[in-house]
Amino acid sequence: MSLKLMRTVALALAIVAAPAMANEEAVKAMEEYLDFVDYGGATIFPEQIPKEDWKRFYVIDARDKDQYAKEHIPGAVNIEWRQVLAKRSSIPKDKPVLIYCNTGSLSAQAGFALRIAGYDNLRILQGGFAEWKAKGGLDAATRASGQARH
């Protein structure tokens, strides 16, 4: 086999092997996460958060900037779901983090990525902004307990 052909084959193998190794590392990280997390452990319902507890969360609105500008949970910061890893240095690890989107599906993906990146202090708002709003927003816990009467 000629030296040129051997170099070409070696380069081709390196190109093919690198993504395979990177993918294997990602799979291992996901396996470790799935072994660690408990069912439902990352989700929280709007009615589980008393009004006075909202201020202790770092709240991330994972929707796009136009949806955020139109309406969002008071105190929330806008980090679109695709950008959570790129902007993770602005997300605290020393306080509870709550992440939401419209329904919970995109925020669940963002939350999964953050957990793989080492964030174990976060919760996904089950049902997202739509359910939070439908259940009474910041007053969802009070409504659920039957204390709010209209």
Predicted feature descriptions by range:
Residues 2-7, 20-47, 54-57, 65-96, ...:
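Rhodanese-like catalytic fold shared by cysteine-dependent sulfurtransferases
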Residues 60:
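Active-site flanking residues adjacent to catalytic metal/cofactor-binding acidic residues
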Residues 100-101:
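Short, surface-exposed ligand- or partner-binding patches at beta-edge/loop junctions that are enriched
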Residues 9-18:
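Bacterial N-terminal signal peptides
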